[in-house]
Amino acid sequence: MPMSLGNAFIKNFLGKAPDWYKVAIIAFLIINPIVFFFINPFLAGWLLVVEFIFTLAMALKCYPLQPGGLLAIEAIAIGMTSPGQVKHELVANIEVLLLLVFMVAGIYFMKQLLLFIFTKILLGIRSKVLLSIAFSVTAAFLSAFLDALTVIAVIISVAVGFYSIYHKVASGQSVHSSHDHTHDEGISELTRDDLENYRAFLRSLLMHAGVGTALGGVTTMVGEPQNLIIADQAGWQFGEFLLRMAPVTVPVFIAGMLTCMLVEKFRIFGYGARLPANVRQILLDFDSEERKNRTNQDVAKLWVQGAIAVWLIVGLALHLAAVGLIGLSVIILATAFTGVIEEHSLGKAFEEALPFTALLAVFFSIVAVIIDQELFKPVIDAVLNVEDHGTQLALFYVANGLLSMVSDNVFVGTVYITEVKTALMEGMISRDQFDLLAVAINTGTNLPSVATPNGQAAFLFLLTSALAPLIRLSYGRMVIMAFPYTLALSLVGFIGIMFLLEPMTEVFYSLGWISHHVAPAADALLQSGH
């Protein structure tokens, strides 16, 4: 019997998502305007934030762009925020959007080099604990100079490469044949266990690398977008930023590495999976096959990609241009010198990042609602009104941490540093206290935010990437795997803020490594358009 038109509409709405999910989204769309107009706009704002987090948590059931986008469109339509405010948010975050469009695509054209390097690391280090630390330290080092999103894009691209090599062979095909690695039909029962173990192995490496990006990203002013904003407001240069953060970031880095060792050693929270012997053999065969078949043309491509990688790191570390523009230069150089000149070959590179770029634009419209409805204002006001300096520092760290777990850490960091700058201008706090608070804000937004994918853009990118469903990495699983790290980083960060920050900063002053800033200088900074 043919389907009625009404049923066809319902069937088409959100496609293959489960029926209960469709009902939930429709219920949200009905409830929100009622709460906004008849109960309380503030409550409606928080309801929207919770609903948006729900769509992120269900990313494996349905990509969050559609349900989240519907909620955002309705929020703008009923006046929770305005298209102007959304545009303002997008303009303010244009660097992040450019980064996603161009940098992630640029990394795609450096795949051969990345697979070459990481295959050597993966096959060279037998111990899983050492391998995990190697991934974490590499990610931390890279994200101290590059953006965390770029680093995660690199690691995702490597993991997809590893996954598809094994999947092809396990499905009974040759390594170089074209193959769809999203379907498991061709895999025999014997290799299915290996595949599950391999998925768990890749999951754990990706989570170690993801946390590594947070550990490295907090240390320097170029590590995360909000670090740049905070450094700009405080008038700090690269070296001063590094030193002022060190009393908190160094102990936290050590705690992160210890956590990495412990979860692998005791195989807890979903870690500890080893590389199955069969998979290792397939990767070894692939490596020797690649070596045998490598022509001079392939070697030339690797050299070109190596040179571009050097340009990428130098360009980003010295901030020679906006991150996205450096990404565009990578696309141009890599394609020109490796001979990729057809339009359809270029298109593939953009497939990974553009859905996420659209999702991020929706995310910024939710941020616009948070700003217009002043959802964080009660928390900020309460913290600013605390008299005791030490308590104020600790509370700033905690409040930032909690808000960064629900909202984007770039947004939280920006809101807080702006409010604190205003307090400094109005003479509510001294310049020295402002400098200490800036450290509390930076560490508070960067460290506890590893708890959930909505806190760190890099985690969100990983969760919504094409790789996540392949290795069965869901929102819930990410939260569980991040938990030991969240606990260790948040607690050690808190101890650093409470007991190490002030005495160590005084030591740095007395050694002459950093100098006291004066409030008028900050004033001049504001007037000069910062």
From Swiss-Prot:
Listed GO CC annotations: plasma membrane
Main location: membrane
Catalytic activity reported: 2 Na(+)(in) + 3 H(+)(out) = 2 Na(+)(out) + 3 H(+)(in)
Transmembrane segments: 23-43, 45-65, 90-110, 113-133, 140-160, 205-225, 238-258, 308-328, 351-371, 451-471, 479-499
Coiled-coil segments: none
Keyword terms of this UniProt record: Antiport, Cell inner membrane, Cell membrane, Ion transport, Membrane, Sodium, Sodium transport, Transmembrane, Transmembrane helix, Transport
Membrane topology of the entry: Multi-pass membrane protein
Cited HAMAP family: NhaB (MF_01599)
Stated name of the protein: Na(+)/H(+) antiporter NhaB
Species of the source: Vibrio cholerae serotype O1 (strain ATCC 39315 / El Tor Inaba N16961)
Name of the encoding gene: nhaB
